[in-house]
């Protein structure tokens, strides 16, 4: 049904995607300017799992929002030298999942976020064109939180219900679509755990 909202329910939260607006409930909405239209006729067919922490291995601050909205302050490198390497980037992701499972959405799912970079999936290049990017607040070597796995599985399920072009089998890591260039979500990410949760939620 066009414009319908699909939902999954758990004891913890409700994840709902409205395919009309491309928005996830209950995500906190933060508008990123780093977006554009997908190529005509292109639907989301892949979900890409990333990890991010700003500064590296530090969690809970405002810096991911600042990066994805191009509002890092000029003195950010004084806060941490790593910021000098990302000051001029224009990047985004559709969704961020914080350590406590909070959803933050930057780009509606029907639009193209700038998350994948040079990439290829099953021989098809330019993954930004046909993928949805989900960032987990974390790093390659540190275990992700149970709340993040629950939230990620719920988001994937809701996305698959809203966009039939997606499926739980078409979920890849950034390292899978950009091998040798990217390593996230890294060895700390428990893919079997995610697959088990997806079997429970997707059936």
Stretches with model-predicted labels:
Residues 2-26, 40-41, 125, 130, ...:
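Basic/polar, cationic surfaces and motifs that engage anionic cell-wall
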Residues 134:
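Conserved, mostly hydrophobic/aromatic
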Residues 2-125:
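N-terminal catalytic cores of peptidoglycan-degrading enzymes
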């Amino acid at each position: 049904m066009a414009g319908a909202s699909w939902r999954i329910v758990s004891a913890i939260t409700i994840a709902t995607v409205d395919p009309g607006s491309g928005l996830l409930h209950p995500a906190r909405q933060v508008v990123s300017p780093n977006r554009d239209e997908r190529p005509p006729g292109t639907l989301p067919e892949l979900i890409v799992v990333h990890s991010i922490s700003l500064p590296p291995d530090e969690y809970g601050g405002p810096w991911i929002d600042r990066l994805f909205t191009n509002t890092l302050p000029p003195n950010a490198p004084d806060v941490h030298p790593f910021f000098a390497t990302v000051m001029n980037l224009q990047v985004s992701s559709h969704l961020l999942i914080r350590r406590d499972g909070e959803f933050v959405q930057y780009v509606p799912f029907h639009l193209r976020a700038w998350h994948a970079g040079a990439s290829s999936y099953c021989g098809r290049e330019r993954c930004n064109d046909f993928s949805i990017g989900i960032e987990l607040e974390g790093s390659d070597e540190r275990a992700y939180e149970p709340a993040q796995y629950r939230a990620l599985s719920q988001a994937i399920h809701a996305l698959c219900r809203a966009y039939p072009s997606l499926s739980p089998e078409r979920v890849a890591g950034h390292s899978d679509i950009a091998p040798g260039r990217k390593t996230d979500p890294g060895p700390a990410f428990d893919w079997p755990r995610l697959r088990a949760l997806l079997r429970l939620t997707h059936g």
